[in-house]
Amino acid sequence: MKVRAITEDDSRNYIDLCEKLDQETKFMMLEPDERTITVDEQKNRIQSLLSNENSMIFVAEDNGELVGYLGAYGGNVQRIKHRVHIVVGILQAYTGRGIGTGLFNELEKWSMQVGIQRMELTVMAHNEIGLALYKKMGFSIEGIARDSMFVDGKYVDEYYMAKTLPYARNGNYIYFNE
């Protein structure tokens, strides 16, 4: 298993990964068949993302297949350049193998290099596997968005979670064990 930064050459495989995630889990934003991006559009998005100093996508690769990703999307204005919003997706067949931990460790290494001080995410309140990973990685719940998602005919709450990175203030860095 290899965790690395995304490249433009990953465009087709990244779309395939996202489409698989849309099919197999209800915890992602898009319903199956709502994803309409082309390979060229994805290449442009990746190129644009990589040109932004405070945004990145890390992918987990197994024998040439993308099996997970973590996107970190930073703001463009001065007052929020220190924070990123995170989106994570890992194929169900690969959960419980340390991939999430590996993705977050890469995120934290990168964050230290580019000066990210705060990481934020949302997670559906009933996503126990996601919640466990995020808590393991040091995130805490900061709020609840009531009825913020509509899934399978029901409104679902989301937790707002965040982690403040201490090394951004004092130079220390802590790796998490896989």
Label every model-predicted segment.
Residues 2-16:
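A short beta-loop-alpha structural element at the N-terminal edge
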Residues 8-9, 22, 34-93, 104, ...:
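Acetyl-CoA-dependent GNAT
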Residues 26-33:
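A short, aromatic/hydrophobic, helix- or strand-capping loop or linear motif
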Residues 59, 71, 85-89, 118-122, ...:
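Conserved beta-strand segments that form the floor/walls of ligand-binding pockets within enzyme
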Residues 97, 101, 113, 126-144:
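Conserved active-site alpha-helix within GNAT-family acetyltransferase domains
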Residues 104, 111-122:
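Conserved GNAT acetyl-CoA-binding A-motif
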Residues 120-124, 135, 140-156:
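Conserved catalytic-core motifs of GNAT/GCN5-like acyltransferases
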Residues 154-178:
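Terminal substrate-recognition subdomain of acyl/acetyltransferases
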